[in-house]
């Protein structure tokens, strides 16, 4: 039984690690990194700044996922974020969870 539990814990840990590593790759694949970086403001805000601004907000994930897909303006300055029709709802939520985890 102990062996089964150990294998289960290791499997879950490995899958979680792979998912965490995949999110920067997804951000690159969906062209997020053309305007954003983790720590530095480019055209759009740094992901760490987004995470800080929305920390603790219950609706942050849904609000940001909608902005990823539909675009938005006025939150971070004069340059609007364009819509991203190439990003699915599931991908938007995956990306936003990763962005909100940046600290």
Language model features by range: what are they?
Residues 1-8:
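Bacterial N-terminal signal peptides that target proteins for export
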Residues 21-38:
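Sequence/structural segment immediately N-terminal to covalent heme-attachment motifs in c-type
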Residues 34, 42-54, 67-96:
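Axial heme c-ligation environment in periplasmic c-type cytochrome domains
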Residues 57-66:
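Post-signal/leader-peptide non-cytosolic segments of secretory proteins
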Residues 11-12:
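Repetitive helical segments and hydrophobic/amphipathic motifs
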């Amino acid at each position: 039984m102990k062996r089964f539990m150990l294998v289960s814990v290791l499997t879950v840990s490995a899958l979680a690690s792979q998912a965490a590593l995949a999110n920067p790759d997804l951000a690159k694949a969906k062209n997020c990194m053309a305007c954003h970086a983790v720590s530095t403001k480019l055209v759009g805000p740094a992901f760490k700044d987004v995470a800080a601004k929305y920390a603790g907000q219950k609706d942050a994930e849904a609000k940001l996922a909608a902005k990823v897909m539909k675009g938005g303006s006025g939150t971070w300055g004069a340059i609007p974020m364009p819509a991203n029709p190439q990003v699915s709802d599931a991908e938007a939520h995956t990306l936003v969870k990763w962005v909100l985890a940046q600290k």
